[in-house]
Amino acid sequence: TKLKSRYDKKIMSDNLKSKVTDLLSSGQIKGFLGLRSNEGHIGPYLFTNEAELDHLVIGDWQRPGDSRYPLNKFLIQIACKYPEDTFGVLVRGCDERGLKTLYTWNQLNPAKVVPVGIACPQELADACECLKPYPDECVDGQKATACEQKTVSSIDALSNADRFALWIKEFTKCIKCYGCRDVCPMCFCNECSVGSDDLIHTGHIPPEMPIFHLTRAVHMIGRCIDCGLCNEACPADIPLRTLYKKVADIIDKEFQYRPGYSDQKSPLNVL
């Protein structure tokens, strides 16, 4: 669900700035991957000295979560280039789940990562229907209440035929822009199945349906951290987050596993 309301929360955080200042000045980290305000725009930035921290923001500009980026995905690239250095990174609840999952897949070394957590406001938690809208440790914000999965429940209430028709209708809107894959912090395969001609032929719009989205849903098993960036990136407004929430519910029911809620590795990592 995309938030529509006006949101007037300040985007600066003294607590966050103080924490990152301590980490940089003490030499605990080489840099801090967070969000930077620049002439009214907010984007990812690697802060390497204290003087830059006047531009450090939490990302809530006009509404909660309106300036979110897959920081963990950027962190993987930074860590590959500087494997001996330790970096801090700004995390919300979903980002922290992503880090924990990436550790189990050996994409990041936990000894070289210092997460700095902020809690999501209740408005954002409600819109995301998030089960854990905060990291384990927060330097800013109040821990919001976990939310019911109302959207998934409403679709579950439909008949099999109506559910099938709903998803087929949604999938036909796809223009195969790969936005969902490219923004996903948990897509890190060296060779992408949904980009392979052997499985899904390129150059066809709309893509072969429903194989494209069902293949991606299978690959989200044991990986999806429910960050919702796929929803935000989709120009066709396909409710991809709802699809992956349902997949996550099935895996939780059958295997008692949700990515990032523990240090446990996915029981389905063979996929």
Residue ranges with predicted function:
Residues 2-173, 181-186, 190:
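Iron-sulfur-associated redox domains of electron-transfer enzymes in respiratory
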Residues 151-171, 186-271:
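Ferredoxin-type iron-sulfur electron-transfer modules in oxidoreductases and energy-metabolism complexes
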